[in-house]
Swiss-Prot record:
This is Selenide, water dikinase. ATP binds at residues 19, 46-48, 66, 89, 135-137. Binds 1 Mg(2+) ion per monomer. GO terms for biological process: selenocysteine biosynthetic process. The gene is selD. The active site is at residue 16.
Length: 344
């Protein structure tokens, strides 16, 4: 039965493209009263990747939750991708994951399929050096899976998205194009080589990238997921009080993604991201499929790291030596200008 199941056919939208758009989400969150505590080091105020709560002078808890609908048809791969995506928030904060809880919404008729999803998630968490400690399930006709992840970090070594500094160099650790490729997968229009490459990109942990950036020392970091490169860069720029400038020609793309974008296989999340970022992003170059892919919602995307120019060469060299998909210098941090983001 497992071989006959195509998980993506159960869903309306795939992966992080299924997120509520940033514009709608902002309208909800702005009405919430933000409660604060001196030990809550990172909360709702900066749209960061995870919450951080200080327990004592040496330990802070980093906590996040992330789950979504299937992005691929193979249940084991889906489990691995969902786990890698959830763990990424902890890595972006410079923390070490300790344990995770499964979050499951699944049709009861496909328990054998669910077993494979959970096996994939468990294997990826094990690869991260963490543990699955339990979870929660809901019966649902549209499958969803992910994790609630808890990690730790020294309170003075938290890497936030709100501390980028003018003069910093921006380095991205995975190529873009996942949202477009996932749309092609769901429509059964994705070439097999592009499909297989995208699966490998999504399954790849940001663990080594996080370890290297901690050793080198960086100013800020965020992971690139549902709001796309430009959406998450906007959160970094706005929270840091700076402007970010991207070089369009330096943007890395998964092989085959550009061609799929040219075919018009653009996910709805891309258009939601564009709408939200209107007036915040200034495109100074021809708007083509590369620009679409900069708005494209990613699933288990890479880290966007803001590092001082003095340390950028070392970080770039070490990341490229270690990471499976390399690292790419994609832009710079500038003093605050009229727009939060420029693409040149």
């Amino acid at each position: 039965m497992i071989e006959k199941i195509k998980l993506t056919q159960f869903t309306k939208s795939a992966g992080u493209a299924a997120k509520i758009g940033p514009e709608a989400l902002a309208q909800v969150l702005c009405q919430l009263e933000i409660t604060w505590n001196e030990n809550l080091l990172v909360g709702l105020n900066t749209n960061d990747d995870a919450a951080v709560y200080r327990l004592n002078e040496d330990i802070a808890i980093v906590h996040t939750v992330d789950y979504f609908t299937p992005v691929v048809d193979d249940p084991y791969d889906f489990g691995q991708i969902a786990a890698a995506n959830a763990l990424s928030d902890v890595y972006a904060m410079g923390a070490v994951p300790l344990f995770a809880l499964n979050v499951v919404c699944f049709p009861a008729a496909y328990i054998d399929v669910l077993k494979e999803v959970l096996r994939g998630g468990n294997d990826k968490v094990k690869e991260a050096g963490a543990l699955i400690a339990g979870g929660h399930t809901i019966e649902d006709e549209e499958p969803k899976y992910g994790l609630s992840v808890t990690g730790i970090v020294h309170p003075e070594k938290v890497i936030k998205n709100s501390t980028a500094k003018p003069g910093d160099v921006l380095i991205l650790t995975k190529p873009l194009g996942i949202g477009v490729i996932n749309t092609a997968i769901k429509g059964e229009m994705c070439p097999s080589e592009t499909y297989l490459l995208a699966v490998e990109v999504m399954k790849y942990l940001n663990k080594e990238a996080s370890e290297i950036m901690k050793e080198v020392g960086v100013n800020a970091c965020t992971d690139i997921t549902g709001f796309g490169l430009l959406g998450h860069a906007y959160e970094m720029a706005f929270s840091s009080g700076v402007t970010i400038e991207f070089d369009k020609d330096s943007i890395p793309l998964i092989e085959g993604a550009r061609e799929l974008a040219q075919m018009g296989l653009i996910p709805g999340g891309c258009y939601r991201n564009k709408k939200y970022l209107k007036g915040k992003v200034c495109i100074k170059v021809e708007e083509d499929e590369v620009i679409d892919l900069m708005f494209d919602p990613q699933t288990s995307g890479g880290l966007l790291i803001s590092v001082s120019e003095e340390k950028a060469e070392e970080l770039y060299r070490r990341l490229n030596k270690k990471l499976k998909f390399g690292a790419f210098i994609v832009g710079r941090v500038k003093e605050k200008q009229e727009y939060d983001i420029y693409v040149r």
